[in-house]
Structure formats: C-alpha cells, structure tokens
C-alpha cells in the first residue's frame, strides 16, 4: 500500500486547485498561469493530515531522470507547506505530462544544491530574485526515481 493511496485534498487556495485540475485534464499540455509552460505536479502526503496534496511547480530535470523542486514560494518569508511534507516523509509522486512516478526525495546542499540551483535558474530565472527577496534559505530537493519492485 502506497501512502499516495490516501484521499486527495485539493489546495484551499483556489488558483492552485484549478491549476492541478487543468494539468490532470490536459496532461500538462496547457500552460500554467502560475508556473509557465514547462511544469509538473508534485504529490506529497500531508505531514499532519495524511492526505495527498498536489502542487504545480516549474519542471526542473536532468538527463538521468531526476528532478528538483525548489521551495521558493515566490520569495515569501515562509516555506511552502509541501516542504514540511517532504521533510516529514521524503517520498514524492510526480506527474510529468501523462506519466506519474514515485521518487525518493533528498534535500540537497553544497555542490548538489548549486548544480540544481543553476539548472533551475536556466528554466525560471526569477529564482535568484526570490532568494534575494527573503531572509530564509530557499530549500532545494532532489527527486530520484524509486526502484521498481516486482
């Protein structure tokens, strides 16, 4: 049984819930009003609620099948809720187009963080602006595909 079998609880912020619905209906073919043309849906499990939460994010990937998710929240003073969820349960599901897969999650620092941060800024240049506008250290998580078990 996967923790992602839990019930889905849409975001209480209507624009996010609508973006998730748009992505799932079109497999990401329609651009996002929030995160642009190249986007993904991150699934986490609520640390307190135990329900599935879904968040539209900028697509940041490498050639090895790994992804990064950046907890910028537009440079807000606090981390997005999904950061707390990933720290509590370092497991994610990610929808990229029509494909949905599970990933192991690692919060990265040092060289790994720098490499992902550079890649992220190539896709979405506002990340440096977000970091400059907040006193918090914006977290970066690497998502590595989970091994498929028979």
State where each predicted segment sits.
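Extreme N-terminal tail/first-helix region
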Residues: 1-35
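Short coil/turn segments at secondary-structure boundaries
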Residues: 35-38, 131-135
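Short beta-strand micro-motifs in enzyme catalytic cores
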Residues: 40, 139-141
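Short strand-connecting beta-turns/loops that link adjacent beta-strands
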Residues: 62-64, 99, 148
């Amino acid at each position: 049984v996967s923790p992602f079998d839990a019930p889905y609880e849409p975001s209480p912020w209507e624009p996010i819930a609508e973006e998730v619905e748009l992505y799932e209906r079109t497999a990401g073919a329609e651009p996002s009003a929030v995160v642009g043309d190249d986007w993904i849906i991150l699934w986490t499990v609520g640390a307190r609620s135990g329900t599935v939460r879904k968040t539209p994010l900028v697509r940041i990937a490498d050639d090895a099948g790994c992804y990064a998710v950046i907890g910028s929240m537009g440079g807000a003073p606090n981390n997005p809720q999904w950061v707390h969820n990933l720290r509590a349960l370092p497991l994610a599901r990610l929808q990229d187009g029509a494909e949905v897969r599970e990933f192991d999650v690692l919060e990265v620092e040092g060289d790994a963080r720098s490499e992902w941060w550079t890649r992220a800024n190539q896709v979405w240049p506002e990340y440096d602006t977000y970091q400059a506008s907040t006193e918090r250290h914006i977290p970066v998580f690497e998502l590595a595909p989970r091994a498929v078990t028979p």
